[in-house]
Amino acid sequence: QHYSFNRYADIDGITRVYISKTLLKAIIKSENPAMKISGNKVNLNNKELLSKMDGILVLTGTNTRIANMMHEDATKLSHTKEYEHILYRNEKELAIDVFTRESKGVILEIILIDKTDQNNRIIQLMGQFTPDDILSMIKI
């Protein structure tokens, strides 16, 4: 079971976008299946990668209080056994945390927390991934 961000479904000050597996299949069939999320920081730039996804959820906090609340909630993942904190980078041009949940050597969920600007974003990718998939998505 993936981490639920449902508490943010109806909160004022949060933009919530979900892309289903069905829509991802349509994107794969298009001539240019590239998707960029959170500016140019997360690139989902090939059919093979998109075909591994079961869904994408993007939450953007549109004010500082909400953005901080989202960030605090998401970083609680590092205190659980199910999630591993695999990447932390904090520079002016890129400030991200990446968490993964895996089972039997397969990464089932990737959660990226983008703190680069005042509008924190949480990007949740569900599917079946490899470590190389993560490296292809994120500019490190």
Tell me what each language-model feature is.
Residues 2-65, 69:
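Early exported N-terminus immediately downstream of N-terminal targeting peptides
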Residues 67-69, 108, 139-140:
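Terminal interaction module
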Residues 99-131:
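A short, solvent-exposed beta-edge/loop patch
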Residues 71, 75-102:
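Short Gly/Thr-rich strand-loop-strand
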Residues 3, 37-38, 59, 107-108, ...:
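Localized chelating/binding microdomains
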